[in-house]
Amino acid sequence: MTVLSIQSSVSFGYVGNSVAIPTLQKLGHDCWYIHTVYFSNHPGHERFSGEFATPKSINKKVQNISEIRGLDNCKAVLSGYLGLLSNAKVVASAVDYVKKLDDSRLYILDPVIGDNGKVFVKKGIRSSIRDILLPRADFVIPNMSELSWLSGQDVNNYSAMIAAACHLLKGGPKVVFVTGRVENLQIANYAISEEGVWRAAGQFINRKFNGTGDFFSALVTGLLLNGYKIDDLLSVATAACELITFETQKKPAKELAVITALQKMEIDEIGVRVEKIA
């Protein structure tokens, strides 16, 4: 199956499309990718350089791919870091085009805004994700901070997290995946839908990792297309994130150990325990 992935790219390291492409390929999918930014490396380093893709350039790429029938078999659109505020409408247009071909096709929204209370996107992007992209999404994958910003609610405990996720469900998505909730010595991911709440957790490593959210979103996209049910998907994606952080922890570099992790990742053999808690 084919995924259209519209998000950031770096020459060095693994964030955005740079991690999504090999992950989706590992799961057996073609990935047609359009970059929203072209950076030397992720901004977690002391310095970086690069350019933002304009709405015109992104739209032209989508148009050209469609003209050569490259989107005929596209089964999902995945979007992440937008770069520019005006790119939200271009992503929305691409989603609308793909769904017009077949309304069963999926849109997975990784609402990249920030983390740990810190916003790292341009002014206005938060509201454009909430108002333009969220209503189109079949699945949305916020971290705890992004869940708070999108819902307009404080998310300072479990009950507040569930309430905020249910608020997002009213806006269109079928499932809200909430990532990265630290609980004791674990880091937990949740799947919340009208059918219930599922929890899966891996070991918490007290270190900053750049790109794990992008990795998780690509896993969710690929596993959905592979027919995984929500609980099994959550189990595998959480286990894969635990694996990649373990492998990265072994190295002094700031970049995710994507190649090593993907080589060791056997989808049919990995998984963590999933609880259905509501």
Describe the residue ranges of each PLM region.
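Charged C-terminal helix
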Residues: 231-278
